[in-house]
Each structure stands twice: as C-alpha cells, then as structure tokens.
Amino acid sequence: MKSLRQVLRDYLVRRAFVGGYSWDVDKYSLILEVITYSLIPVPVITYLITKSLPLSLMLAPTPALPILLVVIWSTYSVDSVKEGVEWELPFFVVLLDIVHDVGGDITHAFELSGKVGLRWIGREWSIIRRYSLTTNSITKAMQVRARLHPSLEFQRFVNGYVSVWSYSGDVGGYVRSVEGTYLSTLSSRLSSLSRQIIDVVVATVSSLVVLILFVIVTTVLGMNYAILYIVPAVALLLPALIARVYQSIPYIIRMDVIRDKSVYMALGASVMVAAILILYLGVKGVMALMLPPLLFSAMVTRRVNAMRDSIMALPDLMRDISEIVKAGVGIGAAIERILDNPYPPPLIAYLRGINQLSGNAEVNGPWIMRFAMGVLRELSSLGSPSRALDRLVEVFLELKTIMMGINYGSRSLQLLNYSLPAVFAGITYISRFVVQTISSIIENAPYALIGLSIPGINAVLMPLLLTAYIVSLSVALLSSLLGNLSINPTIKYVIPIPLTLALMLITVEIPVLA
C-alpha cells in the first residue's frame, strides 16, 4: 500500500508532466506529508481544550486543507498552460503560414514564436526540445508533448500537422485549412465572453441597487440605522468582480499601458487630500473622493486613446507596407517611406524602433502591438513575403472587428454607468422624503410611538455616499475594461463619479415636496 507521500508524489509528477513544469516533487510531497500528519490531532486537541463537540467536528477537515490547496494550485497551473496556449494558437498558425510561404517548417515557426510575443508557444517549444534529447526526433517529441498536453486544440493541431508532414507532405495546405477556423473560433470566444461579462455585471449592479432600497426602507421604518453600513461592505464585492473580469479578458487583446511614477505619486497625493477633507468637512468632504479617479484618468487618457488608435491603425499600416513591398521594396525601406504618414505617435515610435540598425528595440505596450512589431521585424529577415503581409492585414482586421464588437456590446454597461447619478440622486431624495414624512407623523401624533426611532438624514447619507462612490467607481472601471479593454479609465468613463456625488449632495439641500 502506498504511503501518503508516495500518493502525493505520483499526483504531482502527473500534473508536472501535463503542465510541462519542473517541480521538486520529492520536496513538495515530503512537506505536505509532514504538515498533514501534524494537523491530524487538531480536532482532538480542540475538544480536550474547549469541550465543544461541534467545534471539533468543524475542524475535522483541517488535515486535508494543505492537500486541497496543493490540488487547487496544481490545477490552476495546468489550466494556465491550457488557456495560454489556446489563446496564442491562432496567431501561431498565422505565423506558421508565413514561415511556410518562405520555405520554412514548424520548427522555424516555433523558434520565432518567442521573438514575436508568443510566450506560451515558445515555452512549448522549449519543452519539445527537452523531450527531443531522449526521443532523438523532433516529430516524436512533438507527439509526446501533444499526448500529454492539457489543451485538446493543441493536441489536434500538432498531431494533424505531424501526420500530414509524415505522409502527404502538404503541410501548407493543412495550415491554411485550419487557419480560418482558429481565427473564427477566437472571434466567437471573445464575443461570447464579453456578452457573459456584461450580463453578470449588469445583474450584479442592479441587485445591489435593489438591496440599497430595501435597507433604506427597513431603516427608516424603525430598525437601527447602523445596518446601513452593511451596504458599503456589500458594494466592495464589485472590486472583486473587477479583478475577476480583468483576469477573464485575455492578455492578447488587453490594452495595458505603461504608467510612470508621476501617475502613482499624483494618485497617492490626491488620496491623502481626499482623506483630510473628509476628516475636516464630514459628509460634505466626501465630494473630495472624486479627486483620485479624475486625476488618474486625466493623466492616462491621452496615452490610452493614442494606444487604442495605434492598434486600430494596424490593418492600414500592414496594407500600406504590403503595397510598397509588392513594388519591389524591402520592409525596412517600406517602413521608412510610411513614417511620414499620419499614424498615431506611439505607432510611429514603434516603427522607428524596429527599423533601427540593431533591430532589437524593446516594444513596451499591449500584446497585440508587440506581436505586430515582432512579426514585422522578423519578416525583414525572411525575405519580405508579400503574401504574408496580406495575411497579416486579414488577421489585424479580424482583431479590430473583435475589439470593436466588444466595445459596441458594452454599450449597455456604459449607459448604466451614466444612469447611476440619476439613480443614486433619486434614492437620496426618496430617503429624505420618507424620513421627513415619518418624522412629521411622529411629531404630530397625539400619543407616543414607543420603540420607533427615525434616523437623521445625515446618518443615512454617509453610507449612501460611500456606496454610491464604490458602485460608480467600479462600474466606471468595468466600462473601461469592456469599452477600451484597459483597466485605465479615460475621462469619459469617470465623469459619472463626480456627477453622482454632486447630485446626491444637491438633493440633500433642495426642499422636499410634501
């Protein structure tokens, strides 16, 4: 019978082979065994100390927690390999088609994958080369890796390619036949993912607004108004949703821009100013909470818009270069000729960088931009195949269509973002109306209503303002994630935040119609 250490070791070995990892399984299994056995007496010791049987029973699964955490960690590691390879596989197929056009094969495409930003595919190539040291054959090593790989798409592609390579030899036709399928599948996955995210976000925010109304009604009808502070805590679920949405958006289409230290310094200073104003001014100082998002968005708006324009201009760039190359000009000379065209400044800067003599200028920007510049840089050494450039035009047109489709699909979320000021202003007005109406009834009643406490509007307003701020900021970030595919919101996405706070404070000052 196997010991716990042997069982854990065998499990980690299998997961390491599937994921292509080099884990120290002996060390991990030994540590897990020691921790698990040391936790077995915990329920018994707890019962001897507390004499509480329910508490001891609750702690009974404690010894299994380390094993559960390792299972979750190993599963997440393997799933990361699967998702990363499946997102990059369509672009690798495009790169392979380009390499075939100049007489290369899949090994050359694997070699180039790391240079053009396909890091997960490049990782697979390093694993295949390691396997080839024992199989003495690249094709056998590819089949071994495909057999162990967690992605069925990668398995089918590699096995199909090796089969065609071994028999008919028409690998170019095979690649062209699956290229369109992979690109259309990529488009469908991204579109369905964006729709699911939008539906979940809208449902969550709508449910939160209903919860706020329910808590307000129960509060003004006599419950302790401290329960209102539960609502901001519930609203903090939205930042967790933002983190999950950010992870759900594939890095291949995210527009992450580089932020310098001045942005973080300004953000920190604005947070300190807002905190000081709230301490001194109380409820009215909450208006200062608009400073951090407004200042941050003002500093990144130009950069985000320029980067988005650069990505949207990639199909036109590839088309212009393709037309010049077809006239018999090399890619380097073609890039020099189009530098005077009215392209966005970041795109011009990237083109100047890759056209230097060294050709090794680092591209700091979104993954799409790194892939485009990397392919252009490598094409100059592949002989400037015009057909490859035409294929790149189609690829970037497809990506542009996908990104525009996600943007249009998020319009409902953007409408929700701009409707939040009116929603929260209406909630504030209704709260004042109900509070003042019931207070007037109690004051004019001929008898005492014992046990009925009506909170003041200021007691209701502070948690409402905090909730409105959290919800509005979260929806602004979510709108930016699905509109610009960036966690950096531009001005148009954060405008509802100060509008929400201002309208709520104005609503408190205007008279209530009795």
Task: Specify the residue positions occupied by each region the protein language model found.
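Juxtamembrane/interface alpha-helical elements of multi-pass membrane proteins
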Residues: 55-146, 265-361, 370-377, 384-406, ...
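Hydrophobic alpha-helical segments characteristic of transmembrane helices
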Residues: 1-19, 91-113, 141-207, 322-338, ...
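Bilayer-spanning, highly hydrophobic alpha-helical transmembrane segments
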Residues: 32-47, 55, 59-68, 186-245, ...
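Membrane-interfacial amphipathic helices
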Residues: 1-50, 69-82, 183-186, 200, ...
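Juxtamembrane boundary at the C-terminal end of a transmembrane helix
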Residues: 506-514
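Membrane-helix interface and helix-disruption motif detector
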Residues: 24, 47-56, 219-228, 277-285, ...
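Membrane-interface junctions at transmembrane-helix termini in multi-pass inner-membrane proteins
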Residues: 250-255, 479-486
